[in-house]
Structure formats: structure tokens, C-alpha cells
UniProtKB/Swiss-Prot annotation:
InterPro entries: Mur-like_cat_sf, Mur_ligase_C, Mur_ligase_C_dom_sf, Mur_ligase_cen, MurD. Belongs to the MurCDEF family. Pathway: Cell wall biogenesis; peptidoglycan biosynthesis. It catalyses: UDP-N-acetyl-alpha-D-muramoyl-L-alanine + D-glutamate + ATP = UDP-N-acetyl-alpha-D-muramoyl-L-alanyl-D-glutamate + ADP + phosphate + H(+). It is an enzyme of class 6 (ligase). SUPFAM superfamilies: MurCD N-terminal domain (SSF51984), MurD-like peptide ligases, catalytic domain (SSF53623), MurD-like peptide ligases, peptide-binding domain (SSF53244). This is UDP-N-acetylmuramoylalanine--D-glutamate ligase. One of its GO terms (cellular component) is cytoplasm. It is found in: Cytoplasm. One of its GO terms (biological process) is regulation of cell shape. GO terms for molecular function: ATP binding; UDP-N-acetylmuramoylalanine-D-glutamate ligase activity. ATP binds at G108, T109, N110, G111, K112, T113, S114. Cell wall formation. Catalyzes the addition of glutamate to the nucleotide precursor UDP-N-acetylmuramoyl-L-alanine (UMA).
């Protein structure tokens, strides 16, 4: 992509926008940063853009496809692209191979981050410079996707891709790609579930070596079957059941591959490892977290699809620990007859993720902290499906009505406490105190809110940290010593 002497409008100066602006300026591009909230922006309104002299637009995920400036650019025939598209077109040759580093792309409604981290961990153990990038990126601009794509030292990029990023991305041809699952999320942004699924499916288009898909998700399986991939690209389904030919899954307590990605023939059963070797995939009592097992299977299929050493990858996977706020035990209080465990799954920001979290625990054992910014979601199906697990619910957030209505209609016998949303600073302390009134030995206080966090917290991480602090305080005050 030739960007010297071109004019690019960067819409939104967050980490990715600011980083891309720097990368483009280094290549002789005239960059116009537009952000109404950033004093350092070149312009603070799209009304001030001189569209007659614009060659490209980079749109932040903040802006949906129906935003006026997006429509204006498209009306004029100006390409509107994501940071992902720019990064893909700007990528440079690896200094050792002389060709661009392979990209492994991971998308899905849930499980993206854990899968991306596992993939990076295994490839790093195999001796490759394989950073995580994309939607997973921290505030470190040196690790933004545009920076990683233009760094000749990286051997592989493990890229978490959101549906927002994929919408304005069209030329990807990933080496390996995965869709973990698809459930209703961000439908208002995309304009419907079919548009949402279509954007997710872009990771499969023209994939070169392997695509990995959730064989237990009908929509994902359909997208994989329809995917137009490069000749010789392997299609690997993952399942939590015994795998069929073309799949990797769990059989008799073992991870078993029948896809051929682990070295056997397609249909041949190859035992890879005992599931008990992966302590991070299970609760303290040894029962498995199904969604983490699914993430591990996905990541393993991706790295094997790239050609990584099987034994080294498996060894790294056994020692992997998920990042914070992903079904993480943050406190445990001794009570009469046993203990109460506090589990932080603040990363469960939608109903699909919360369902996976709740389903990991025994019947009537969970005091569930739920609620937040609902983003138009309804929770009737979630509450109905998980009512057998939930002992009591404590509802937080400023958008409480959808969750309240779900319990009233689907599980009226489950006790519910509603936390006054007015004081953000004390909301989690009050929520944990309310949970404590329901607890008994063996119970789990689970914070998996099924909602976004920005109504009362800075981020899901801030929400999780506050829950952990409140849980530790409650345990010190109320636990037996």
C-alpha cells in the first residue's frame, strides 16, 4: 500500500488511531486526526473535513456504519478502512524469512482473548516472536496492531479481531483463523445478527493453512462450510464431545485429534494429552470449566495448523494461566461447615459469556452478581437456562430493568436484591455485602455480570478489581479465623 503523499483521516484518536497516525506520518502520509474529545486532534468535528482532498478514512470501532461521516466518505468513493485493514496492507517482511510474518486471527462473541493469549504462549514457547495484538492490545502503543505489523522482528502475530474491526476490513488472507462462537451481541452496531455473523466470517475468507471453528455452534459451522479458503487449507472443528473425523475434542478424559492437524490422517484418532494435565481449565475440585477447555482446543488447533512443534506447544499449554477477570478465584472465606468462594469473571460482558460461567458450577450454588450496561440485550433465556444454578441474584448497574424483568418472568422464586445505582464508589462493597446474606458453606459468589461495565466503572478490569477488594474485605470481616 502506497501511503506517501496521501491524505488519511483518522476518525478517533484512541490507542489504535494514534498509533496508526504515527506509523502513517513516518511514511510520508498527511494525517488529519478527528476527535471531538481530544485537545490534540487536528479537527474536532467531521463538519470541518475537506473531503475533496481525502484519500482514505480510518474509522474507529466507536463509529457504526451508519455514522454520517462514514456515509459521506462512501458517497464520495473514499475507502473507509479499519486499523486492521491498514495494518494488513502496511505489513513488512520479517527480517529472518524475508516475507511478511504470518497472522493468526481469532474472533467470536466470547473466548477471543483467552484463545489469543494461549496461542501466543504456545508459539513463544516454540521459540517464535509471537506477540498478541489487535483488539486485545493494552494501552502500550508499541504493541498496537499497526506497530506490530510494521516491526520486522515479529515472527507471527496473534491477532484478536472484533466484529467492529472486521466490518471495515476486506483484504485479509490469514494463515490460520478461528471463530470461537457466535451469539447475539452488538446487534445495534451491525444492524442485525446476519450482518454481525457476516463480519465475523471475514476471518475465514482466503485463509491459507487452517480455519478452526466451533463444531457445536450451528452458525459457526455453517460459516466454516461456506468459507472460501485457499487450496489445501484445513478445516478443523473443535468440540467438547468425542470428535468426529475432521475435529479435535475430548474423549475418555483425553484431548483427541481426528482432524489431521496433529499429524495423523483425517479420521485417525491421535491422543494428545490427558485433560487432567491442564489445571487452569478446572475448578479446585477438578471439574472442568467448559469454555476454557474450548479456548484451549481452539488455540491448540491454531498453533498445530501453523506447524508448531506439538510437544512443546502442549507443555506450554499445561502451564498457561488465564489473564485476570476470567473465572478467577479472588477470595475464599471459611464459614461454618466449609467455605465460600468469590469468583471474578468480569470479562463476561454479555449473556453468552455469563451462561458459560454459570454453567461451570453446581446446582443452586451461585449467588450471582449481574447487571450493568445492557446494550439493548434481554436476559430471559439466560435466566431460564441457568435458574437451576442460581441460588440468589444481586443486581448492580444503572440499566437494571432488563435483568429485573428476566427474573420476574423466568425465575420468580429466586431471591433478588437490587443495589441502588447512585453511588458508584461503593456499589461493589454493597453488592458483596448483599451476597453475604445468602451464602452458606459450598456456595460461590460469582461476578459474571452479562453486561458492559462503563456505566459505573472505568472498565471490566476496574469492575473486577473492585469486586476482588470487596470480596477480600468481606472474607476478613465475616470469615472464621
Amino acid at each position: 500500500m502506497q501511503v506517501a503523499d496521501k491524505t488519511v483521516v483518522i476518525a478517533g484518536l484512541g490507542v489504535s488511531g494514534t498509533s496508526l497516525a504515527e506509523v502513517l506520518r513516518e511514511r510520508g502520509t498527511h494525517v488529519i486526526g478527528v476527535d471531538e474529545r481530544k485537545p490534540e486532534a487536528d479537527l474536532h468535528s467531521f463538519d470541518d473535513v475537506d473531503w475533496d482532498h481525502v484519500d482514505y478514512v480510518m474509522s474507529s470501532p466507536v463509529f457504526n456504519p451508519r455514522t454520517p461521516f462514514v456515509l459521506e466518505a462512501q458517497r464520495r468513493g473514499i475507502p473507509v478502512m479499519s486499523e486492521v485493514e491498514f495494518a494488513w496492507q502496511l505489513r513488512v517482511n520479517n527480517e529472518r524469512t524475508g516475507t511478511p510474518a504470518p497472522w493468526i486471527g481469532i474472533t467470536g462473541t466470547n473466548g477471543k482473548t483467552s484463545t489469543t493469549e494461549m496461542t501466543s504462549e504456545m508459539l513463544t514457547a516454540c521459540g517464535l516472536d509471537a506477540p498478541t495484538a489487535g483488539n486485545i492490545a493494552s494501552g502500550d502503543m508499541s504493541m498496537s496492531l499497526s506497530r506490530c505489523a510494521t516491526n520486522p522482528q515479529h515472527d507471527v502475530l496473534c491477532v484478536e479481531l472484533s466484529s467492529f474491526q472486521l466490518h471495515f476490513t476486506d483484504s485479509l488472507a490469514l494463515d490460520c483463523a478461528a471463530i470461537t462462537n457466535i451469539a447475539d451481541d452488538h446487534l445495534d452496531w451491525h444492524g442485525g445478527r446476519e450482518n454481525y455473523a457476516a463480519d465475523k466470517s471475514k476471518v475465514f475468507h482466503n485463509a491459507k493453512r487452517a480455519i478452526v471453528y466451533n463444531a457445536q455452534d450451528a452458525k459457526v459451522s455453517e460459516l466454516a462450510a461456506e468459507a472460501q479458503t485457499a487450496e489445501g487449507c484445513r478445516k478443523v472443528g473443535f468440540t467438547l464431545e468425542a470428535p468426529q473425523a475432521g475435529q479435535i475434542g475430548i474423549e475418555d478424559g483425553w484431548i483427541v485429534d481426528r482432524s489431521g492437524v496433529a499429524g495423523g490422517a483425517v479420521g485417525e484418532s491421535v491422543r494428545l494429552a490427558a485433560i487432567t494435565d491442564f489445571t487452569h481449565l478446572a475448578e479446585p475440585d477438578g471439574s472442568l470449566y467448559p469454555h476454557l477447555v474450548a479456548d484451549a482446543l481452539t488455540a491448540l488447533a491454531l498453533v498445530l495448523g501453523l506447524g508448531a512443534d506439538r510437544d512443546t506447544a502442549l507443555k506450554a499449554l499445561t502451564s498457561f494461566k488465564p489473564g485476570g477477570h476470567r473465572i478467577e478465584t479472588v477470595a475464599e472465606a471459611a464459614v461454618e461447615g466449609g467455605s465460600v468462594r468469590f469468583v471474578d469473571d468480569s470479562k463476561a460482558t454479555n449473556g453468552h459469556a455469563a451462561r458459560a460461567s454459570l454453567s461451570s458450577f453446581p446446582a443452586k450454588s451461585v449467588i450471582w452478581i449481574a447487571g450493568g450496561l445492557a446494550k439493548g440485550s434481554r436476559f430471559e433465556d439466560l435466566v431460564k437456562d441457568q435458574a437451576h444454578t442460581i441460588k440468589a441474584a444481586v443486581i448492580i448497574g444503572k440499566d437494571q430493568q432488563p435483568m429485573i424483568e428476566a427474573f420476574a418472568s423466568q425465575a420468580p422464586d429466586i431471591p433478588v436484591t437490587i443495589i441502588d445505582p447512585e453511588d458508584n464508589d461503593t456499589v461493589m462493597d454493597r453488592a458483596v455485602e448483599a451476597c453475604g446474606t445468602y451464602t452458606a458453606a459450598g456456595d460461590i459468589v460469582l461476578m459474571a455480570p452479562a453486561c458492559a461495565s462503563m456505566d459505573q466503572f472505568k472498565s471490566y478490569a476496574d469492575r473486577g478489581n473492585r469486586f476482588a477488594a470487596a470480596a477480600k474485605t468481606w472474607s476478613e470481616v465475616h470469615g472464621l479465623h
